[in-house]
Amino acid sequence: MIIGVPKEIKNNENRVALTPAGAKELVTRGHTVYIQHTAGENSGFSDTAYEAAGAQILPSIGDVYNIAEMIVKVKEPIAAEYSLVHKGQLVFTYFHFASEEKLTRAMMESGSICLAYETVENPDRTLPLLIPMSEVAGRMSVQEGARFLEKPQGGKGILLGGVPGVKPAKVLVLGGGVVGHNSALMAAGMGADVTIADISLPRLRYLSEIMPANVKTLYSSAHNIEQELPTTDLVIGSVLIPGAKAPHLITRDMLKLMKKGCVLVDVAIDQGGCFETSHPTTHAEPIFEVDGITHYCVANIPGAVPQTSTLALTNATLPYIIKLADKGWQKACKEDKGLALGLNIIEGKIVYPAVAEAFGLPCYPIE
């Protein structure tokens, strides 16, 4: 198979979808790998390293899309790439379609096969290609939240972990999945007073057993969240419904309960966000303010630490890339039901129910 890896062009997206080691593995199996010039540079991989692994370098993004049977990316194609995706081409990346109608319709019109990292499942219903980036995003969300609590950044001017004789900041984590788990661990490690909320009692029991003493658990309800907000300094929103839009757990009216200078970090923003007042931001302009509350809503948080996140991502994706290249997407998905759940759009038809539901469009069975 001919595999193409374009350079990511989303704002400050520094990751790359394939390392030289991954390229070598594919070339060894008889596949042809094309890498766009400097695609791996920000992740620490030179064109020379890819060439040494047997990959070929192409000068432009158009060249890569034009020649490839399978495009492997990190983030969804942006508007400038829509016309480059062509009929019958397999695109394997994070899509998050349910929050992006223009992207969804563009990919339907392209006639491509869209296989989304975020909806591939393990037999136990965990999400193997979302987990590594959720781990990174969870940890970084606390780092970024702590930074924007500083006075020069417009925050309240408090240190997350406090100091002896001074209370630490209070952190509320909404959602006890992988992002929430990692957020709570990071905040607790920095010395904050942490509460993690979830609707699953079994999950709360598990978290209560494994978390440090400065992490408390709370059943997630509108009432309980409202009770927490007046004393909370930093909220991490990490709610996930696979493939679907995230629910709004904090409304605009609820912002009035918070003190000015508090920070909301919406890690769920690539699925539409879990705060009513959220809208996507970038690493170049990461924050905005609503009613005196700072919102951090960067949709590609791990892109800021590409040398960590590229390796974490490609460790997870490479086995699937190999399977797709070796067998073709139809046979690979027929043999691996978890991989088949990654299929969101096939040649103009939506085949993932949550995406169809988000836009009131028909959902077709996978043939």
Regions found by a protein language model. Name each.
Residues 209-292:
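Rossmann-like adenosine-cofactor binding region
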Residues 76, 136, 177-178:
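Residue-level detector of alpha-helix initiation sites
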Residues 2-110:
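An N-terminal-biased, well-structured beta-alpha scaffold segment characteristic
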Residues 23, 47, 104, 142, ...:
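Generic hydrophobic/aromatic pocket-lining and core-packing "Φ" positions
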Residues 69, 75-76, 95-96, 221, ...:
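Short glycine-/small-residue-rich Rossmann-like dinucleotide-binding loops
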Residues 118-159, 269, 274-367:
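Adenosine-phosphate binding glycine-rich loop
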Residues 6-42, 152-240, 287:
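Glycine-rich phosphate/diphosphate-binding loop of Rossmann-like nucleotide-binding domains
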Residues 2, 8, 79-169, 298-300:
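Glycine/serine-rich phosphate-binding loop and adjoining beta1-alpha1 elements at the start
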